Amino acid sequence: MIGKQRLWQTSVVGLLLASFSLFSVLYMEQIERRMLEWFMVLRPGTMISSLWQSPAMDINVDLYIFNWTNSEKFSDPTVKPRFEELGPYRFTERMQKVNVEWHDENSTVSYRRRSRFDFDPKLSAGRPSDPIVAPNLLIVGLYQKMVMWSPMLRSLMLLALNIYGKEQAMIRPASDWMFDGFDTPMIKMSKMVPPSLVPEMKFPYEKIGYAYPRNGSMEIYGHHNVYTGRDEFRKLGQIARWRYNNVTEASPRCKLKGSAGEFHPIPLVKGRPISYFLPDLCRELQVDYSGTTIFEGIEAYVYRGSARNMANGTDNPDNSCYCQDNCQEVRSGLLNISSCWYGAPVFASYPHFYKADPYYGEQVEGMKPDKDRHEMVIMLEPKTGMVLEIKARIMANLLVEPKTHLIYRTARRTFFPLIWADYNVRITDDLLGYVKLMPILEFVGKICGILGVVLGVLMVFWYPHQMIWQKSLMHKIEISSIETNRSLEPVKNNDVEDSPLLKGLKYIGAKDAVGNGN
C-alpha cells in the first residue's frame, strides 16, 4: 500500500514539474515581459520611482555659441553674415523631479523638473569670459509682435525704440548668453509699461539669455503630467499634460504626445520611430529607426535624426499641425518654435543646418555640417527600452527680416545661428551590469526549465517503471531462493543419516542418558 502511494505521489509531482517547466520554456519571453512591466510601472516608494525622480545618470551638455564676426557690415545686403563657432562650454546637468504628486484616478503622476548646470573648465575649450557678438534678440522679437499692433501704438513704440533699442548687435561675455543672463534698457522699459495697456510688452524675466533661467529653476520647464503605466503599460512615461494643457501652445488643434524622456513603449519594434516631448521646443520631436548595433556586448536599436523629422508640414504631414494660424512656414530643415520663445521668431534645426535645405547654409558663412558631430543618435535596449547612449544635438536660429522704419530695414531675410547644444548621456556601469545580467538570467531560466521537464518526465515514467522492475526482480529472487532451499533440504537429511560419525555420536549420547537415569 505504501509503495503504491509513493508511486502516485511521485507521478503527480513529476507531472506538475514537467508541465510548469514546459510552460516556462515556451512562454519565457511573455513571463519575462510581465515581470518587467510589473517592475517598471511607476508607484510611490518603489526603486524604479526613486531612480525616475533622481536619475543616476548625469548629462554632459556641450554648448557652442556663434560669434557674429562682421556685424558692422550687416546694413550691406550684398555681404553675408559670417560666424565662428566658439566652444564647447561643458556643463554637467543633474536633473531632479520635484513636487511629485500621484493621481490614481487616471494613472498619472505630476511633477516639475529642476536641473542644475555646473561648468566644467577642464573639458571646455571656451571660457565664460569670451566676448560674443550676436543679433539683438529682444528687439527682433519685439518687432515681430509690433506688426499686429495699431498704427498709433506702433509709432509710440518706435519712438521708444529709437531711445532704448538702437543696437542691431550686442556684445556680451559667453556666460551672459548662456545661463547667467543680462539686463538691457528694453527690459527695464517693458517693466514700466502697464500690462493691461500692451500685454505683448510683458517680459517674464528680469534678464535675457539663451539658457536663462534654466539653471536651478523649476518653473522654466513647466508642470508635467505623465502616465504611470498602471492601467495601460504602453503609455508609461508618455506625456499627458504640460502646463496643465493636453494641447500644444503653438496650436490648440495639436495634441501633446511623446515620451518625457525616461521610458519608451516596449518591446521596441524595428522600423518604428520613437517620439519625445521636449519642453525646450514646446512640441514633439520624432527620431527614426536606423538599425541595430552591439553596445558593450548588448544588442541595441539605433535611432537617428533624419531630414523628415525636421521637415515642414508640406514635406512631412506629421509636422503640419505645429505650424498654423500666424505661424511662419519655412523650408524644410527648421521647426518654428516661436511659441517657446515668447513670440520671438526662433527656429530649431540640427547644428550647422545639417540635413536642412541648402538655402539656409547659403545665407551665411561659417557653417560646416558634419555627420559625426551634428547627427542626433539614440541607442536603446530593445526589451526594456532603457537608454544606453544619447547624443542629442539641436540648434536655435533667429529669423531677421527687413522691416520699414527699423534698424534691420536694409537687411535681407536671414536665419541667424545663435547657439547649439550637444546632450550626451551614457548608461552607468551599474545599470549596464543589470542590463547584461538579463539575457544571462533568461538563458539560465530556459536551461532550468528544460532540466525541469526532463526531471518531471523521469518522475512520471522512468521512476515508477524502475520501482516496478526492482520489485519484480526482488520477487523473482525470493522465489528462486525458496526453490533452491527446498531442493537442497532432502539431500542434507540423507547425508546425516548415512554418516557413521553421526550414528556413533547418537549412540554414545543415548547410552549416557540411560546411565544418568539410573
Q: Which role does the model predict for each range below?
A:
Residues 514-518:
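A positional/structural detector of protein chain ends, strongest at the extreme C-terminus
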Residues 2-299, 306-512:
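Extracellular or lumenal secretory-pathway regions
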